[in-house]
Amino acid sequence: MSEIATVARPYAKAAFDFAVENQAVDKWQVMLAFTAEVARNEQVTELLSGSLASEKLADIFIDLCGDQIDEHAQNLIRVMAENDRLSTLPEVLSQFIQLRAVLESTVDVEVTSAIELTKQQLANISAAMEKRLSRKVKLNCKIDKSVIAGMIIRAGDLVIDGSVRGRLERLTDVLQS
């Protein structure tokens, strides 16, 4: 996974820098999302792992995308095909989104709880995380019954585990040591 991230990083950075410079970040995110979906397609995946010449592969990929991508995105596709990197498009999209979040000073916060949280609880979590991280947050909520009670909050490298499951695991570790 980290190898794919390393390979995708320069393409994501180049696309992001170009998008910012041309005030087209939304447009580029849509184009990259479309190309990532094309790259994820099972038949396209087989095509990418085949032995087609890079120029032919780029032409086929661009034809599949049709008018969903502009000439600049087509150039990115050609360069990525030339370097045998089209399969990394989903990771390029992921890193592009991360770069955009940094630019907009937002951070994705994943909240996992056993039950659905109320709007007031979500507002309280959002306010507390914005204060702690000194950035705007975007909450993504998941329900996972294995949490038992409480919640787990993830924001980048920060993990706050206030779940009963987490407490039981920590207690088990203490008792076993």
Swiss-Prot record:
Alphabetized InterPro entries for the sequence: ATP_synth_OSCP/delta_N_sf, ATPase_OSCP/d_CS, ATPase_OSCP/dsu
Entry's Gene Ontology molecular function annotations: proton-transporting ATP synthase activity, rotational mechanism
The organism's place on the tree of life at top rank: Bacteria
UniProt KW Magnesium keyword: no
Gene3D superfamilies xref list: N-terminal domain of the delta subunit of the F1F0-ATP synthase
One Gene Ontology term, aspect cellular component: proton-transporting ATP synthase complex
Key word rRNA-binding present: no
Keyword terms, alphabetized: ATP synthesis, Cell inner membrane, Cell membrane, CF(1), Hydrogen ion transport, Ion transport, Membrane, Transport
Major place of residence: membrane
Compartments, record wording: Cell inner membrane
Membrane topology: Peripheral membrane protein
Entry-linked SUPFAM superfamilies: N-terminal domain of the delta subunit of the F1F0-ATP synthase
UniProt cross-references to NCBIfam families, sorted A to Z: ATP_synt_delta, PRK05758.2-2, PRK05758.2-5
Record-stated family: Belongs to the ATPase delta chain family.
Function: F(1)F(0) ATP synthase produces ATP from ADP in the presence of a proton or sodium gradient. F-type ATPases consist of two structural domains, F(1) containing the extramembraneous catalytic core and F(0) containing the membrane proton channel, linked together by a central stalk and a peripheral stalk. During catalysis, ATP synthesis in the catalytic domain of F(1) is coupled via a rotary mechanism of the central stalk subunits to proton translocation. This protein is part of the stalk that links CF(0) to CF(1). It either transmits conformational changes from CF(0) to CF(1) or is implicated in proton conduction.
Subunit and partners: F-type ATPases have 2 components, F(1) - the catalytic core - and F(0) - the membrane proton channel. F(1) has five subunits: alpha(3), beta(3), gamma(1), delta(1), epsilon(1). F(0) has three main subunits: a(1), b(2) and c(10-14). The alpha and beta chains form an alternating ring which encloses part of the gamma chain. F(1) is attached to F(0) by a central stalk formed by the gamma and epsilon chains, while a peripheral stalk is formed by the delta and b chains.
Name used for this protein in its record: ATP synthase subunit delta
